[in-house]
């Protein structure tokens, strides 16, 4: 609806330019927002205040002329001036009701992508292998998954790329430690403790560290024995990751793994191509690219190091190879990198070098979707009591156990199997939603008590709202397919819920554009709150007439479907009963 209003305003401005009321050459960014008080309309624009000065008119006078020039539209009943010059737009309730009825007959709930479908690469999760995933991997994994799901729902071809750290010193450490301490494959499955012991030896013994580095050199040279061990370590580590992805209900598979090692053969080509273009400069023995737009605090050029003085490659080298692959081989139109925002400068430099070097052969928009840190209650990065890194599996297990205690307290009569299955959904959903509901770029404090609360913007609250809507049809004893009639909007609670449901497509397009799932979380929370008000104030099964009951059942069903679809796009599971 907002896009429709923007188009109508643009047509009115064009008309006023033709009439000489407005000067030529105006290209205003037309803003249309939802109103808070629906008695003053459903949407508002400040366009008259933006253009009053170039028009040489008072905002309210210009607003009058814009309203007079607005083309009629069936979805709008009227437009009015408010305050110093706002233009408020009122939806046609009959047209709104018809749109919602149409959404009920559409698998996509009437949602369409605002622009053309694209091929989009999602760079997400990307843990360093050789050890288990920890809480620091949660945000990239679930935010990337949520955005990928939304883009797919809107019609994009999404290519997930799990750029795991599967190459480097850590594998030399593991191989050196295995030489000293031969163990069975079963013992090796406890990779975390094995890695910790190897790291301790690496830090304490220079001789061990030298052996580890030597094994890395052999690995890079293609030594068969080293490659066999490396493959074993990698497979064990990836199997750990896959269990986490399945537990988190994240759409990542082994087929999506495209780790650092996948680009090894192209790294020398990256270096040679940069050299051939005269972009590589030697600095303190390292091969670097200097770009004018990157300088340090003293105004000196910042290097993008491509090859270290010892001949080793860096993340930038691999990322440049990945850019070239994603543009040239995958033919992506857009590449979204869900990586900690502390890597912002790194990606700015990589993207700039890639463009300068012509590595983006297929037009591809590259965006670093940086995110903030998950902190403990003290506001510091989340750690164990002894200061160690919290394993992701331990966090999720604790979430399930806490949810189990909560569900059992509220429903002690439920069978044990039901308690466990409900607790698993509530626990995992709560951890994910607590993260996804925060702005992507913000830090936040992890708090089990808040995220498992049945009040406020939490997963349990939304799950309950969904089961409440689904419960209406259980009480009715009929499936929705048996419900006829059409939506009619009269009560204030009906109108407010209907207007919010009609915004679903706009919300999803915002998530797709900005890579910010919290927008969808806020929307679903609003829908749940408005449905609660509707449920309490507008009798559904006890409606005054069959026509009214059918209308309210249809609103309830659209609410149920919207909540379910929205939660599933966030990667959350729903419960039919709690």
Curated annotation (Swiss-Prot):
It catalyses: tRNA(Arg) + L-arginine + ATP = L-arginyl-tRNA(Arg) + AMP + diphosphate. One of its GO terms (molecular function) is ATP binding. It is found in: Cytoplasm. Its main location: cytoplasm. A motif ('HIGH' region) lies at residues 127-137. It is an enzyme of class 6 (ligase). Transmembrane segments: none annotated. Its EC number is 6.1.1.19. Keywords: Aminoacyl-tRNA synthetase, ATP-binding, Cytoplasm, Ligase, Nucleotide-binding, Protein biosynthesis. GO terms for cellular component: cytoplasm. InterPro entries: aa-tRNA-synth_I_CS (IPR001412), Arg-tRNA-ligase (IPR001278), Arg-tRNA-synth_N (IPR005148), Arg-tRNA-synth_N_sf (IPR036695), ArgRS_core (IPR035684), DALR_anticod-bd (IPR008909), Rossmann-like_a/b/a_fold (IPR014729), tRNAsynth_Ia_anticodon-bd (IPR009080). Pfam families: Arg_tRNA_synt_N, DALR_1, tRNA-synt_1d. One of its GO terms (biological process) is arginyl-tRNA aminoacylation. It comes from the Bacteria. Belongs to the class-I aminoacyl-tRNA synthetase family. Monomer. This is Arginine--tRNA ligase.
């Amino acid at each position: 609806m907002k896009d429709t209003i923007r188009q109508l305003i643009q047509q009115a401005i064009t008309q006023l330019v033709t009439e000489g009321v407005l000067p030529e050459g105006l290209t205003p960014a037309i803003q249309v927002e939802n109103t808070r008080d629906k008695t003053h309309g459903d949407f508002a624009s400040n366009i008259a205040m933006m253009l009053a000065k170039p028009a040489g008119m008072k905002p309210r006078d210009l607003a009058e002329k814009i309203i007079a020039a607005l083309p009629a539209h069936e979805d709008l009943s009227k437009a009015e001036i408010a305050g110093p010059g706002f233009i408020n737009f009122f939806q046609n309730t009959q047209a709104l009701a018809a749109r919602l009825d149409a959404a009920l007959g559409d698998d996509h709930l009437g949602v369409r992508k605002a622009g053309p479908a694209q091929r989009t690469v999602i760079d997400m999760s990307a843990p360093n292998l050789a050890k288990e995933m920890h809480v620091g991997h949660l945000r990239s994994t679930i935010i990337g998954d949520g955005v990928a799901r939304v883009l797919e729902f809107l019609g994009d071809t999404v290519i997930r790329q799990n750029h795991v750290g599967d190459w480097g010193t850590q594998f030399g450490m593991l191989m050196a430690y295995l030489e000293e301490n031969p163990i069975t494959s079963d013992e090796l499955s406890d990779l975390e403790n094995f890695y910790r012991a190897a790291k301790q030896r690496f830090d304490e013994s220079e001789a061990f560290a030298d052996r580890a580095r030597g094994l890395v050199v052999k690995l890079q040279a293609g030594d068969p024995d080293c490659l066999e061990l490396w493959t074993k370590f990698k497979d064990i580590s990836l199997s750990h990751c896959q269990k986490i992805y399945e537990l988190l209900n994240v759409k990542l598979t082994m087929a999506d793994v495209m780790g650092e090692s996948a680009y090894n053969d192209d790294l020398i080509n990256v270096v040679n191509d940069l050299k051939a273009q005269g972009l590589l400069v030697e600095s303190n023995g390292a091969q670097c690219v200097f770009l004018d737009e990157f300088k340090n605090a003293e105004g000196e050029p910042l290097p993008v190091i491509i090859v270290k003085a010892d001949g080793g490659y860096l993340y930038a080298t691999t990322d440049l190879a990945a850019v070239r692959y994603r543009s040239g081989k995958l033919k992506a139109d857009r590449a979204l990198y869900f990586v900690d925002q502390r890597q912002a400068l790194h990606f700015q430099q990589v993207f700039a070098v890639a463009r300068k070097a012509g590595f983006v052969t297929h037009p591809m928009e590259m965006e670093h979707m940086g995110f903030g840190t998950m902190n403990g209650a003290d506001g510091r990065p989340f750690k164990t009591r002894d200061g160690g890194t919290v394993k992701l599996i331990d966090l999720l297990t604790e979430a399930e156990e806490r949810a189990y205690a909560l569900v059992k307290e509220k429903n002690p009569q439920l069978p044990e199997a039901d308690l466990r299955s409900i607790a698993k959904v509530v626990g995992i959903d709560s951890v994910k939603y607590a993260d996804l509901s925060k702005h992507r770029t913000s830090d936040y404090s992890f708090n089990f008590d808040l995220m498992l609360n049945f009040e406020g913007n939490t997963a349990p609250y939304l799950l309950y709202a969904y089961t409440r809507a689904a419960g209406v049809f259980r009480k009715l004893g009929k499936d929705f397919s048996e419900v006829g009639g059409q939506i009619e909007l009269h009560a204030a609670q009906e109108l407010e819920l209907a207007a919010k449901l009609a915004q679903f497509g706009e919300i999803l397009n915002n998530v797709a554009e900005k890579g910010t799932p919290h927008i969808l979380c806020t929307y679903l929370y609003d829908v749940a709150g408005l449905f609660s008000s509707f449920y309490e104030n507008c009798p559904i099964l006890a409606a005054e007439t069959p026509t009214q009951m059918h209308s309210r059942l249809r609103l309830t069903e659209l609410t149920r479907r919207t909540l379910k679809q929205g939660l599933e796009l966030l990667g959350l599971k729903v419960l039919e009963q709690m």
